[in-house]
Amino acid sequence: MSSPKIVLYTNHLCPWAHRAHIALKEIGLEYEEVIIDLSTPREPWYLEINPVTRPRPHHHLRWNHCNRIRHRRPIPRRRPPNPPPPPSSPTENALYRARLSFFVDAFFSKVLPSFFASLRAANETERDAAAEQLVAAIVKEVEPLLADTEGKGPFFGGSDKLTLAEVQSGPFLLRTLSFAKPEHGLVSAKLSTLLEQAPRFKRWAEATATHESVNFIYDEKLVADKMRAKFAPAAKV
């Protein structure tokens, strides 16, 4: 049976839409891509299929397809080269899903606020402070949750393949690390050194950001330029 043809309404600048690309790349599902220009009013044809009071099509698609992926295993491909491992118990599955959800929530609620604070920073001093806060949150909230990666794969739970934790956090890890390059000036250049305080997280973040399924649509300079323009400090009167 052939896979259903789907249409992904998306924008490569959006980190939330980016997550759908990661999931679809990993499962090897072919799709037609329609880029939505977020800088202009929506076209009539777009509003016909997606009234403004409803979720965006790429959000609907993202959750429909991501939620069909088994949480307890790395994201499977449609035709895996080897037989899948035998199923584990319902209790183990439930615990894994809970751990993954807790991990992702810790990253988004405790770490990302400092990333956005860095984007809004008016000067290097504020960016350095945001980076220190970001790493402090990582050390306290996220680093301990990666203890089971010691001596194993770099991804969540010690997996050697992407899991839903990387699907959800990947676009933000990619932006955080790349924005720390001096040419972008959006995140403190001290970030790489600061992350040495959290070696498990650093390994996880770098492995995720360099994975082809995570970065294949990422235009670093374009995204950085757009973010700089969007979060530029307001001129003081």
For the regions a language model picked out, list residue spans one by one:
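GST-like domain detector, emphasizing the conserved glutathione-binding G-site
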Residues: 1-154
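Eukaryotic N-terminal targeting leaders
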Residues: 1-7, 230-237
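Acidic carboxylate-rich catalytic motifs and surrounding loops in phosphoryl-/glycosyl-chemistry enzymes
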Residues: 36, 215-225
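Surface-exposed helix-capping loop/turn segments at secondary-structure junctions
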Residues: 82, 144-158, 181-183, 211-218
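Short alpha-helical "patches" and their helix-cap loops
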Residues: 89-91, 119, 129-132, 182-203
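Charge-biased low-complexity scaffold regions
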Residues: 139, 144-150, 169, 175-176, ...
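GST superfamily/GST-like fold recognition
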Residues: 157-186, 194-202
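Acidic, serine/threonine- and proline-rich low-complexity regulatory tracts
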Residues: 200, 207-213
